[in-house]
């Protein structure tokens, strides 16, 4: 079932999302990858204030290519999410509502999603140019020195993704593969 969500995402939106749902997001999301996550995590460990307010946000794991004329960003496909697994539970505990990436997550991340009633969405790897069309604008929020890995804010319209792990811990990476195994 395809669902349209206007961001910022609400607790009610998240509660109504089920693993396997197709979702089109419109509104504002933030971005960040490995290097930015490491810096945010280090600040959390020191008890310091983050340079960006993550409370209520969805973060997209992406490092976009340079924009072509007429586009806000270049191809903007998802980064493998496991690279942020060390950092995700701390961010969720601070109020992050969810993440957008690709691939499975470890048990600690799934537990943090359930504990915080969050969500993990996946964007389609290989569809970077299509995804870029849904990104209408961007601005750098912090860590500009990281180049493509700087934390940014994207305004998106009908950004396509799939619910991989819902707030109850239902996980397509566990439930779907057995359906396709040869018996």
Language-model regions: role of each:
Residues 1-9:
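Short, structured beta-strand/loop micro-motifs enriched in basic residues and often containing a Trp
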Residues 31-32, 36-159:
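Feature captures the catalytic cores and cofactor-binding loops of soluble hydro-lyases/lyases
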Residues 88, 164-183:
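Active-site/ligand-binding-proximal alpha/beta "capping" segment
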């Amino acid at each position: 079932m395809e669902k349209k969500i206007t961001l910022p995402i609400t607790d009610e939106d998240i509660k109504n999302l089920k693993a396997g749902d197709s979702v089109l997001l419109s509104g504002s999301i933030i971005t960040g990858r490995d290097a930015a996550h490491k810096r945010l995590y280090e600040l959390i460990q020191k008890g310091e204030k983050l340079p960006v307010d993550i409370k209520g946000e969805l973060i997209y794991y992406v490092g976009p290519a340079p924009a072509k004329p007429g586009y806000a960003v270049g191809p903007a496909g998802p980064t493998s999410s496991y690279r942020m697994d060390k950092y995700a539970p701390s961010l969720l505990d601070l109020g992050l509502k969810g993440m957008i990436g690709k691939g499975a997550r470890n048990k600690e991340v799934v537990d943090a999603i359930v504990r915080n009633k969050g969500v993990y969405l996946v964007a389609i790897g290989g569809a970077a140019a299509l995804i870029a069309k849904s990104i209408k604008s961007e601005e750098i929020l912090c860590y500009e020195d990281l180049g493509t890995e700087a934390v940014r804010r994207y305004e998106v319209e009908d950004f396509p993704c799939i619910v991989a792990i819902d707030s109850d811990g239902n996980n397509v990476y566990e439930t779907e593969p057995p359906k396709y195994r040869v018996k």
